Amino acid sequence: MDGCDCIEPLWPTDELLIKYQYISDFFIALAYFSIPLELIYFVKKSSFFPYRWVLIQFGAFIVLCGATHLINLWTFTTHTKTVAMVMTVAKVSTAVVSCATALMLVHIIPDLLSVKTRELFLKNKAEQLDREMGLIRTQEETGRHVRMLTHEIRSTLDRHTILKTTLVELGGTLGLEECALWMPSRSGSSLQLSHTLRHQITVGSTVSINLPVVNQVFSSNRAIIIPHTSPLARIRPLAGRYVPPEVAAVRVPLLHLSNFQINDWPELSAKSYAIMVLMLPSDSARKWHVHELELVEVVADQVAVALSHAAILEESMRARDLLMEQNVALDLARREAEMAIRARNDFLAVMNHEMRTPMNAIIALSSLLLETELTPEQRLMVETVLKSSNLLATLINDVLDLSKLEDGSLELEIKAFNLHAVFKEVMSFIKPIAAIKRLSVSVMLAPDLPLCAIGDEKRLMQTILNISGNAVKFTKEGHITLVASVVKADSLREFRTPDFHPTASDDNFYLKVQIKDTGCGISPQDLPQVFTKFAQSQPGGNRGYSGSGLGLAICKRFVTLMGGHIWLDSEGTGRGCTVTFVIQLGICDNTNAYQQKLIPLVWPSSGDADFVGPVPNAPNEEKGQASLKSRYQRSI
């Protein structure tokens, strides 16, 4: 029976197997018991865990598994029925809990997987937020640099300083190797290198404005990358450079510079641009980032605004200098004009005395000669001399009065005077002249015309005499009518013009004087010039009449000084004319003093001029003066 021995000699003995199983079950039970303790510890440390009841169930499963292994230690030797029962209960409990845990994990595992998915999503979201925060920080940094550059650029209004500051600040902020500005030439056909940062090459080089790269930069409102071999990128020497740098270019609008003509600015007929070129260091692998290009674009816009402000300032300074020069020239011209006016006034003052004295003597002697026995030929010659002398005296007075009116030195002599006496004096001068031409003269004074008034008696009489004299002068036959009246308050609006605004008052009234004749009349086209000095109408019926053309011009100045308005109406040549003027006079309270008083006036000479003539003896002086005055009045 030796061949039936089946025990292999290399297999360990039963005691050794039992020993290994015993030790393994012990460590398995120890591990099973430690796992729930670890779960309980970490769950307690966690402030939030949604699956506590799952952990409790899982922990019970592990504890029961460990208990089965622990009870199994007593089953390797002879054991009682109680141990077998405990082992059976433990395994049944473990089986029940294990199945329940397995069924529960079917529902729990998808939730755990979704938690992991959400974790990955949150992680990706956090990374995206980190990138956005980095972009925001970059934008804030860019904005800070833009504000700094803008402040530096706008700290001055000198365009050369603006461009130099821009290049320096951009070079420092972006770490540029070179930065340059190409400005359009005066002809507008090329771009000229005007400013560089490092001054590595001499400014003044030009490139054609028709190059494709130039058109590409002009057509884009963004900063773009251009080839390093482009003519615009030739802003630093090429020797010793092996790594080509990245070059960016952006257009700089020249805003509104076409409105200014400033020294070396180009003459622009349309919107034009300069080009700013920026070069990164060639010894690095740097590339242009989007935020850097955006910074360059913003700075280019700020430079454009600053250059336009500088252009406006330069133009305003040039205009100010030109205005100062013009003011100096005007002041010099004003002084020269004042000197000329003073010289003219001095000349007129001398001529007033030097010409009137012999003229008065000629008039006086001519008047005396007419009182003597003369032949018809002699009388005709003397009358011609007297008429010419009177005309010359009138011209002298007109020129003197006009010069005073033009330089503003003539002032009205406001005083109370006899208004009716003025018209009587005028008639005493006009009627003898009209009688020679067989003209009838009539005067009509309104019943409500005040006896006295307050104003310039001399200028009023001179105005009426000038107009009446013209009426007699230009009338061959017919009559002359002078009408004087007071303008009613409710009729003042009829006389209003853009330059004349009469207003009623208790202290003054408006005198209306109208002088109508049946003379040669005035053509409609000549009416606008009748009050212009040295202007004379020349209709057919006016030929042969002499005059200076100053009479009506002086009358208009006098009427304006007296706060009035004058105008002339005529229906045409040969239909006569009517001159009307309205002046403002003051109301005089004391009328008794003017009942019988006539103010002696001499016309056309001024009130302070005396007629000087030969006086044979003192007793005959008064008689000679009366004879001179009578003859002088008749000869006007």
From Swiss-Prot:
Binds 1 copper ion per dimer. SMART domains: GAF, HATPase_c, HisKA. It is a multi-pass membrane protein. Residues 615-636 are annotated as: Disordered. Pfam families: ETR1_N (PF25487), GAF (PF01590), HATPase_c (PF02518), HisKA (PF00512). Its EC number is 2.7.13.3. InterPro entries: GAF (IPR003018), GAF-like_dom_sf (IPR029016), HATPase_C_sf (IPR036890), His_kinase_dom (IPR005467), HisK_dim/P_dom (IPR003661), HisK_dim/P_sf (IPR036097), Sig_transdc_His_kin-like_C (IPR004358). Belongs to the ethylene receptor family. This is Probable ethylene response sensor 1.
